[in-house]
């Protein structure tokens, strides 16, 4: 990735939007990983949140997504979908960190059994993935559809 020209990378990531800016940032990010950690395996093993947050373009959710999904660390990704679902039950959070901490403190025993997870990272990935898939299917135009609202009502 460090060797690819930003223009070529931009073509590969074009469907993600803002691809010209993202291609430069991704290339810079890969170069920073190579300079600091040498290789991807070392990066995954040694990287910490503060280092990632210093990278231009890496916000809280992106940082935690990298730690959870790419590095396999025990980090629960909190996102706007999570906040929306919890908001439907009356929960409000003042910051990303507050939401992330709340989600991390949930009892994941049920998630472990449902998804067959044998470690915390797998459970976090599965739980976050289920939240995203649910909201992609049932959150449109800034609101939940009737099916989601009925489900929420049954869960109260």
Please report, for each region that a protein language model flagged, where it lies by residue:
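Catalytic cores of DNA base-excision repair glycosylases
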Residues: 2-156
């Amino acid at each position: 990735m460090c060797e690819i020209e930003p223009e070529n990378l931009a073509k590969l990531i074009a469907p993600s939007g803002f691809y010209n800016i993202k291609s430069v940032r991704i290339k810079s990010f890969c170069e920073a990983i190579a300079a600091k950690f040498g290789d991807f395996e070392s990066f995954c093993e040694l990287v910490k949140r503060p280092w990632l947050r210093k990278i231009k373009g890496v916000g809280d959710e992106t940082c935690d997504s990298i730690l959870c999904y790419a590095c396999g660390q025990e980090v629960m990704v909190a996102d706007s979908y999570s906040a929306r679902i919890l908001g439907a039950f009356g929960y409000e959070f003042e910051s990303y960190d507050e939401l992330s901490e709340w989600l991390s403190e949930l009892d994941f025993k049920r998630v472990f059994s449902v998804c067959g997870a044998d470690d915390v990272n797998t459970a976090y990935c599965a739980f976050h993935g289920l939240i995203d898939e649910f909201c992609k299917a049932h959150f449109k135009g800034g609101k939940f559809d009737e099916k989601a609202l009925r489900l929420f009502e049954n869960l109260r």
